Amino acid sequence: MSKQTFTTTFAGKPLVVEVGQVAKQANGATVVRYGDSTVLTATVMSKKMATGDFFPLQVNYEEKMYAAGKFPGGFMKREGRPSTDATLTARLIDRPIRPMFAEGFRNEVQVINTVLSYDENASAPMAAMFGSSLALSISDIPFNGPIAGVQVGYIDGEFIINPDKEQMEASLLELTVAGSKEAINMVESGAKELSEDIMLEALLKGHQAIQELIAFQEQIVAVVGKEKAEVELLQVDADLQADIVAKYNAQLQKAVQVEEKKAREAATEAVKEMVKAEYEERYAEDENLATIMRDVAEILEQMEHAEVRRLITEDKIRPDGRKIDEIRPLDAVVDFLPKVHGSGLFTRGQTQALSVLTLAPMGETQIIDGLAPEYKKRFLHHYNFPQYSVGETGRYGAAGRREIGHGALGERALEQVLPSLEEFPYAIRLVAEVLESNGSSSQASICAGTLALMAGGVPIKAPVAGIAMGLISDGTNYTVLTDIQGLEDHFGDMDFKVAGTREGITALQMDIKIAGITPQILEEALAQAKKARFEILDVIEATIAEPRPELAPTAPKIDTIKIDVDKIKVVIGKGGETIDKIIAETGVKIDIDDEGNVSIYSSDQAAIDRTKEIIAGLVREAKVGEVYHAKVIRIEKFGAFVNLFDKTDALVHISEIAWTRTANVSDVLEVGEDVDVKVIKIDEKGRVDASMKALIPRPPKQEKKEEKHD
């Protein structure tokens, strides 16, 4: 295929697609230019079905530092593991694409997005999402797209599609919404306590904008799209399925209805093992034993899936016996740990999260050096999910994509209520340890984070709670579930997480397993989530009604003083010599920003006070008319030099020592002598003149005696 170019304009920026010039050995490849952002997307598919029981889709978003004209950091000077932003973007693209493959599709698919040039005012992630869908759509990979995504901002009551950097900074909303022509299938959002009505309108505005991008993709596919390949889908043997269902469906249904998680898992596993043992023995000599046993496992999974959904849609009974809109039992505890700066333990049924707060000087902020201009990140929310939380063994190591994503969701939910840097000049870190999990652990970590922040004395604007909503749909009828547990998440159609305060929503995240959901379902889920959120906030506020007025005794105390910008270099000193000396003497930590705000941190108030005294002395300036208790440091013929304070000296001219004539300075003053002086002049070079006689009353003039004449 020779190079073909397709051009349109979207959200005020040129959108150019090039096909047929690069990466021609991939199943499908596109170069998408949006503004000055350029993303290459290449998609490939394995020729055979993978052996696992899941769809092996891998989506990568690779940030090349050359795209922003930057050198990579570190000793190796080349790109290493993906940044947090790159990982989150890869997840953002994966989530709307995954539901668009057929049930039973098991071929491995890779979608690799490479950012080749970066424009901070034209979203590279949205260009990559567009390119991912288009590359799959024009390829021979059986993808049931296209899909597209947009970012939505909200400024002065107006919605803005794909806002630029300046607009996003002013926006009350940072929403990414993706979907197909028919429906929304992915949502990711942070918001400044916006109402459900505004959030719903934003979602619909986003989906409306998506239509333009999908239509553009369809035009391109019509010109350059390949015929889709015939691939084998995972299908079980119909006779085998009928046999197992007839014999064991009743037993499996009974096991699924056991209310307690561990007991239910044991009961269902017992039935499954019994069935597997029977069929393994029956077909022991069959050369297709492996395929048969794979089908047995798949059939049992489908039977469990069908029963969970039947219970909810027909009987309106959930596996643990709850009503459709009922939350599991709640418990909230603060001060679970001594010594730390704040801690909160939140439990919802069999899901439990411990959040631990650490406060630090602003010097501990994380420096983010990616494609965007370098910036400092003050608030960190980290999420850990150990395997013991679900009673299993497993891999331990660096945080995976899921943990990074859940941590970022909690971060977005909580950062909206944090005090400003001026109000609270600390770096803030929350670590969520999931101690037990049966679904919705990310939302439990948000609730625990609220407890830890308030217990630690962080003056948040309002407590935040989170809830996960689910959906069971047969295409015609549907049921929205409140507070989904693991089984409902696994066999359900939607995981819709909503976090916020009593005033409004601070974060949304939605993933679905079906092609999309309607505005009616979204509206119902948001309304149901609001009711649940308020119930959880009642429990949180009953435990701790408001942030404590004082920090924990173990937290660093802080005091801030303001100095003139031109005095910053005085406090720091040559090569940091002065500030290092202060820190060595007092044991404090000191941060100085570019505006002259000096923050002093220590657990010892006396050390803070001493540091303030030292810095005040360093930046103090002599003023005309002020009196100082000075020390003579040098004597010259023309006068004496005195030290007013710290490094500020003044000259007392010989004529300013006394009202009477002084013949020799050394007759009146000596080095080391303390004297009181008054500043009488400061010249344009900062040189100070002082006077001793100005503090002495001027003696009256003596009248000349008249001579007597005889």
Curated annotation (Swiss-Prot):
Mg(2+) binds at D489, D495. It catalyses: RNA(n+1) + phosphate = RNA(n) + a ribonucleoside 5'-diphosphate. It is an enzyme of class 2 (transferase). Residues 625-693 form the S1 motif domain. Keywords: Cytoplasm, Magnesium, Metal-binding, Nucleotidyltransferase, RNA-binding, Transferase. It is found in: Cytoplasm. Its EC number is 2.7.7.8. InterPro entries: ExoRNase_PH_dom1 (IPR001247), ExoRNase_PH_dom2 (IPR015847), ExoRNase_PH_dom2_sf (IPR036345), KH_dom (IPR004087), KH_dom_type_1 (IPR004088), KH_dom_type_1_sf (IPR036612), NA-bd_OB-fold (IPR012340), PNPase (IPR012162). Residues 556-615 form the KH domain. It holds the Pfam family KH_1. GO terms for cellular component: cytosol. Its main location: cytoplasm. Its cofactor is Mg(2+). GO terms for biological process: mRNA catabolic process; RNA processing. GO terms for molecular function: 3'-5'-RNA exonuclease activity; magnesium ion binding; polyribonucleotide nucleotidyltransferase activity; RNA binding. Belongs to the polyribonucleotide nucleotidyltransferase family. Involved in mRNA degradation. Catalyzes the phosphorolysis of single-stranded polyribonucleotides processively in the 3'- to 5'-direction. This is Polyribonucleotide nucleotidyltransferase. It comes from Streptococcus pyogenes serotype M3 (strain ATCC BAA-595 / MGAS315). The gene is pnp.
